[in-house]
């Protein structure tokens, strides 16, 4: 379908599906015995295109740049039209080869789920893991800026009043959904950020008393049930479950219509970097659009960067639940020796002011 759409200019085309069944037994000295079975399905296609030999290469993926996975069977794959998706991304990849580069400067930004689930729901939330806040976990981009301000949990302003972030290990189809974690704690749903205020962390039986000691009071009453191990031969680590950025009340089309001239809309993620304390970041995307004279025009090689606290405090809102999307990341890495784990991430399009925007490779 990709070759039919743009011919030989779609010179590199890939696709794949993944299906897993995992059965997990857990027993502890308190008398708990659990037997859980998980079915995971996922698929992704991608294309690289160029105008001619030696020219600029642009790539697109479908449905998302970091995989498309859920706790479901083949019906999950059937729900998306991959043939139509292949034609769309082949056409977009070639269009990007002819498109202007992204603008440079401070602009309003709309960030779509294909990018924001990685930035807002994944890379940022690594900093909410209890072990990183204690300084006992530093692999793969370090600790957390919260480790320096732990006594301020419950009062510290993380973002604007529009920001609500939940850890939920019970949502249907989430790849981070289960009945019990690998310490035997039951699944839970709780806020990490409530109305912009930092109120929670991803905790465990191991980290909870240590965090309370650092906080200076008994803030956490029970484990957050976030401990998971890659296999029976690995030590459980504090892990993201399904991280859900709650939808707002804005109609997505109305959000786009009301955005000022020069606003940039960011699509699927393709690159990321974040500092040792999860504070300063830079993210690049496969595809972007700039609002010019009321129309959304294609832009390539777009990135945005900044300070996570200033960024989240500049949030103007989120689209409503009609635009909310749940993704499953199949390969979140953590630990030494490294372990891979599936984590779920949900968001609707997010709207921000005063975002630093630039060009990848410039």
Each language-model region and where it sits:
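N-terminal small-residue-enriched
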Residues: 1-362
């Amino acid at each position: 379908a990709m070759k039919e759409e743009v011919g030989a200019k779609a010179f590199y085309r890939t696709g794949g599906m993944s299906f897993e069944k995992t059965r997990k037994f857990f027993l502890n000295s308190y008398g708990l015995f659990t037997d859980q079975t998980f079915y995971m399905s996922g698929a992704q296609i991608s294309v690289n295109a160029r105008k001619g030999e030696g020219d600029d290469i642009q790539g697109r993926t479908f449905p998302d740049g970091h995989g498309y996975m859920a706790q479901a069977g083949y019906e999950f794959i059937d729900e998306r039209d991959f043939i139509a998706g292949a034609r769309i991304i082949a056409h977009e990849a070639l269009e990007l080869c002819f498109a202007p580069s992204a603008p440079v400067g401070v602009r309003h930004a709309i960030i779509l789920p294909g990018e924001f689930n990685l930035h807002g729901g994944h890379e940022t939330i690594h900093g909410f893991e209890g072990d990183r806040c204690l300084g006992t976990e530093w692999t793969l981009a370090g600790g957390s800026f919260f480790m320096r301000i732990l006594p301020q949990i419950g009062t510290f302003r993380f973002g604007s009043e529009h920001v609500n972030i939940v850890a939920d290990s019970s949502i249907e189809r989430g790849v981070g959904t289960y009945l019990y974690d690998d310490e035997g704690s039951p699944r839970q749903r709780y806020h990490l950020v409530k109305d912009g205020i930092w109120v929670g962390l991803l905790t465990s039986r191991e980290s909870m008393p240590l965090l309370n000691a650092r906080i200076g009071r008994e803030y956490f009453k029970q484990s957050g049930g976030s401990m998971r191990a890659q296999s029976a031969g690995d030590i459980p680590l504090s892990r993201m479950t399904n991280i859900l950025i709650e939808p707002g009340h804005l109609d997505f089309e109305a959000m786009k219509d009301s955005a000022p001239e020069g606003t940039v809309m960011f699509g699927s993620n393709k690159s990321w970097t974040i500092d040792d304390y999860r504070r300063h970041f830079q993210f690049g995307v496969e595809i972007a659009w700039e609002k010019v004279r009321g129309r959304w025009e294609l832009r390539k090689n777009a990135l945005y960067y900044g300070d996570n606290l200033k960024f989240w405090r500049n949030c103007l809102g989120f689209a409503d639940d009609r635009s909310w999307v749940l993704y499953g990341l199949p390969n979140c890495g953590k630990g030494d020796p490294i372990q891979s784990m599936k984590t779920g991430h949900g968001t609707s399009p997010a709207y921000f002011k005063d975002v630093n925007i630039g060009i990848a490779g410039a």
